[in-house]
Amino acid sequence: MKNLLLILSFFLVFSCSRDEEKVNECKLSTVNVSTLAYDDINISSTYNPNFSEKIRLSYDSQNRISKILGSFIPVMVGSLGSYTISDDAYDEITYSGNSVYVKISANQMIRPYDKEFVILNNKIASQKIIIGTNNLVYNYEYSGNQIVEKINNKLIRTFSIENGNLTKIEKWNYNDSNQIIGKIETIFSDFDNSENLLKNKFFINGAFIKAFSKNNFRNFETKGYVLQNGSYVSDGSYYTKTLAMTYNSENIANVFEKKCN
């Protein structure tokens, strides 16, 4: 009888512990757009009062991100095809095997594109940009600390990884004869020691670049180069930005918010 009570007590404590873990489970709930990069769409600089400056994540029954509130709506007047981000629009995310499908601005009449990602062992293998009946497919090849992005075997970008973080992107420029004539180089620096909660979440719109890194960069600079006599020479273009971040008691950057059950 005494042994039976001990066994029952063990299972009771174990069950309570598991229940407590379940209750205290935390998920990424919001991301401030200051840490995102929408580099494949023309975003209007016009202030939108209907946007909270954060995207908000919802999850399905398997704890996978299924909906993101905060997506694109068109700017109608003098927009030149540009969009703004609004809390009135959301993205829908579905899964099939290794593929992740993202329906951008799912509840809007005018939508810029949809996306499909193939992710293998937390590595991006390909992404497809779907615009109407047209598809643009990017494939990714891995070699040492470099990741090469190609379209139909044409080099588009090279990503350099150091210590688990993306430190450099080189985007190659071509002339009409498909010869490289220059490049745009982006350097990421001043990484913190805080966990990047967007790591491997390539499918979140705007998070593709950040998803390569385990930590958060706090500075980046972009320079343009032209190819002259076999060497890359600065074309004079330059842009830099510093991201101010603070951290909570769990050392999580203030660009993220987590919600615990």
Language-model-detected regions and their locations in the chain:
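C-terminal motif of bacterial Sec signal peptides marking the signal peptidase cleavage site
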Residues: 14-15
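Buried hydrophobic residues that stabilize the cores of well-folded domains
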Residues: 18-261
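Sec-dependent N-terminal signal peptides
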Residues: 6-10
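Positively charged n-region of N-terminal signal peptides that target proteins for export
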Residues: 1-5
